[in-house]
């Protein structure tokens, strides 16, 4: 019900397997001649959710996009495991508030006892389901992993959350057996690579190992360990030494690279990191994407000319960013129609900054919005037409200008970049 797009895409990992258009009744049909058992996900923009498929399954999926996850129900052959997984997902989502507010302030032993009680309850329900319906070996393993790795994830988070909640200056001492669960961790199970609880755990686990290991052996205090280059090189080394599953390696390397690169470290550190990354993950399947990001960052360094991108004014004329910024100080910022609250906030912020910096022109670029909708929003929000521009090429702008933060801005003077990673809230 209430479709938000005209089609549904089925993925195995990151590869599309099949797609189907919705018919006049908002229904779709897929038939797979050959099927690899395992975890898939179906995507109906902008939402996605898991589905576990085995040979011979015949599933009907019902949902209302207004409450995508909450309304999702599976029926038919294969329904038992999939309904358990979606119920588990919803239950886990709702538990985080309880864990953070009620469990995290507790001492380590009490925290573990509370958390393990939740885990035991879920495993008990899974065992009952398995006894009644005899789940496949791989299906059972995946459901169990969904429970275990979410539990492990919270235990990895606990020392840092606890320090924050209690207001302690250093991490709390932990019992010797607190991390015993790590002996159960698999670094090379291909069936779990794209399972969110597993990946979320693995990413935080690597970061935790990097932090704790450096705290013991690098002769640095906790604040300095978070040095961008130092900490992230530790993460690269750990992924390289621990993780053997290729897809998992590639994805973890990619995530660490993106998180580091988008923090805009010094030019020297940036090049050191990239050299280390290429030495450890030179065949990464995401390499083109990572190299493109790194090149875009290089092109936004101080004193570099603005990239050759065109935008459209309200008269339908195309202008280059360089021409718009050719005289004096200009700050480019970004907004989009589908994010109305952000538009209100950023408009208010730009108004304040314009009064504070009358010698600077603040120029808005609208992304991910139709041309007609853009023009309507200009009037609705009282935006000056001469300082507002539009582009229909979101991908080029997002990638070339590295627009990954809602208050990302670019400060220029006479057509050259002063700060390619300015923040409207903190840089002015």
Question: What are these model-predicted stretches?
Answer:
Residues 145, 149-215:
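Extended amphipathic alpha-helical segments with heptad-repeat/coiled-coil character used for oligomerization
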């Amino acid at each position: 019900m209430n479709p938000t797009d005209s089609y549904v895409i089925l993925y195995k990992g990151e590869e599309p397997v099949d797609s189907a258009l919705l018919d006049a009744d908002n229904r779709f049909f897929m038939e797979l001649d050959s099927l690899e058992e395992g975890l898939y996900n179906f995507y109906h923009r902008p939402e996605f959710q898991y589905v576990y498929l085995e040979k011979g399954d015949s599933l009907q999926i019902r949902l209302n996009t207004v409450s995508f996850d909450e309304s999702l129900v599976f029926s038919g052959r294969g329904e038992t495991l999939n309904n358990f997984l979606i119920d588990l997902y919803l239950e886990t989502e709702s538990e985080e508030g309880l864990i953070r507010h009620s469990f995290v302030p507790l001492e380590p032993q009490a925290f573990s006892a509370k958390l393990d009680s939740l885990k035991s309850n879920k495993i008990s329900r899974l065992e009952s389901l398995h006894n009644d319906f005899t789940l496949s070996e791989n299906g059972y393993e995946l459901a169990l992993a969904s429970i275990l790795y979410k539990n492990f994830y919270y235990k990895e988070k606990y020392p840092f959350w606890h320090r924050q909640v209690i207001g302690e200056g250093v991490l709390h001492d932990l019992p010797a057996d607190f991390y015993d669960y790590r002996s159960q961790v698999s670094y090379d199970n291909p069936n779990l690579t794209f399972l969110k609880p597993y990946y979320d755990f693995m990413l935080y686990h690597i970061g935790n190992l990097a932090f704790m290991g450096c705290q013991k052996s690098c002769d640095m205090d906790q604040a300095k360990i978070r040095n961008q280059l130092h900490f992230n090189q530790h993460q690269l080394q750990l992924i390289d030494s621990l993780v053997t599953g290729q897809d998992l390696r590639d994805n973890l390397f990619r995530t660490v690279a993106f998180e580091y690169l988008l923090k805009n470290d010094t030019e020297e550190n940036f090049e050191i990191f990239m050299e280390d990354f290429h030495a450890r993950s030179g065949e990464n399947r995401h390499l083109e994407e990572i190299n493109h990001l790194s090149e875009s960052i290089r092109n936004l360094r101080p004193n570099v000319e603005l990239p050759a991108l065109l935008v459209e004014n309200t008269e339908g004329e195309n202008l280059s960013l360089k021409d718009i910024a050719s005289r004096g100080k200009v700050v480019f910022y970004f907004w989009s129609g589908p994010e109305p609250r952000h538009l209100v906030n950023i408009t208010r912020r730009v108004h304040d900054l314009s009064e504070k910096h009358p010698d600077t022109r603040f120029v808005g670029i609208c992304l991910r919005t139709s041309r007609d909708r853009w023009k309507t929003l200009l009037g609705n929000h009282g935006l000056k037409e001469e300082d507002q521009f539009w582009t229909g090429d979101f991908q080029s702008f997002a990638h070339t200008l590295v627009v990954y933060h809602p208050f990302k801005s670019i400060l220029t003077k006479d057509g050259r970049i002063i700060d390619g990673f300015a923040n409207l809230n903190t840089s002015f």
